[in-house]
A protein has these predicted regions:
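Internal helical hairpin/lid segments
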Residues: 107-152, 157
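Short, well-ordered strand-loop elements centered on a beta-strand within folded domains, enriched
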Residues: 92-100, 111, 138, 148-152, ...
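ATP/nucleoside-binding phosphotransfer catalytic cores, i.e., glycine-rich phosphate-binding loops
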Residues: 141-211
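A generic structural signal for short beta-strands and their flanking turns/coil linkers
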Residues: 82-84, 133-137, 173
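Catalytic core of DAGKc-family lipid kinases
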Residues: 1-120, 126, 171
Length: 211
């Protein structure tokens, strides 16, 4: 894992985003998979990524999980923010991820690597320091015994699993790895099959989200 560069899109303690205009969303996504599909479709067509109204998912939870659904997006409480995404190459196939990526052979044995743009994966607060617009990805990797994995699952709910001497963690902008055996790649909750290698990098300020 290598850190590259030193800039940040948003600085800690700095106000993030702006009040959103009513009707400002071009498309809507209720979860990370739907948001990812919108981004991938426009990247594939080489067309501008539309402004997306987001009402659910792990990225939405990192934004504070505001209630109200689409009704909120039309209200004075709606906010507009820039979001980073992850460009991913698995073998010779290109993908986008918006919230997180997991590399593993099994949840219960073998190494697991998490690449996080959002701090959340479901109920798990995997990367408490992660921010979806700071220009960095948070990476955690480990190969824990089964007993420690059970304990870790409990601590992931509150984010108290770090620091842990059995888990390597860091912040990166780019990442590449050759796997010793074909390894599952799970992008935003979607299993994209087993692959021998991966390369990825952060794409800062890739899209605008209203929430």
């Amino acid at each position: 894992m290598e850190m590259i560069g030193a800039w940040m899109t948003i600085k800690r303690g700095q106000d993030w985003g702006l009040p959103a205009e009513a009707g400002g969303a071009d498309q809507f996504a209720a979860n990370d998979m739907e948001l990812r599909a919108i981004v991938e479709a426009n990247c594939s067509d080489q067309t501008p990524i539309p402004v997306v109204g987001l009402t659910g998912g792990d990225l939405w939870r990192a934004l504070g999980a505001p209630a109200g659904g689409r009704r909120r997006l039309q209200s004075k409480e709606a906010r507009e923010v820039s979001i980073d995404v992850i460009d991913v190459c698995l073998g010779d196939q290109n993908y986008i991820a918006v919230a997180h990526i997991f590399f593993l052979t099994s949840w219960w044995r073998g190494p697991v690597t998490a690449v996080m743009n959002s701090e959340w994966r479901g109920r798990w607060r995997v990367a408490p320091r992660a921010h979806p617009n700071d220009g960095w990805l948070d990476v955690l990797a480990g190969d824990l015994p089964i007993r420690q994995r059970f304990l870790l699952r409990e601590r992931l709910v509150t984010g108290d699993h770090l620091p842990n001497s059995a888990i390597r963690s860091g912040r990166i902008k780019e990442f590449s790895q050759e796997f010793s055996r074909p390894t599952r790649a799970i992008l935003d909750g979607v299993d994209e099959g087993r692959h021998d290698s991966v390369s990825l990098k952060i794409r800062p300020d890739a899209l605008t989200v209203i929430y």
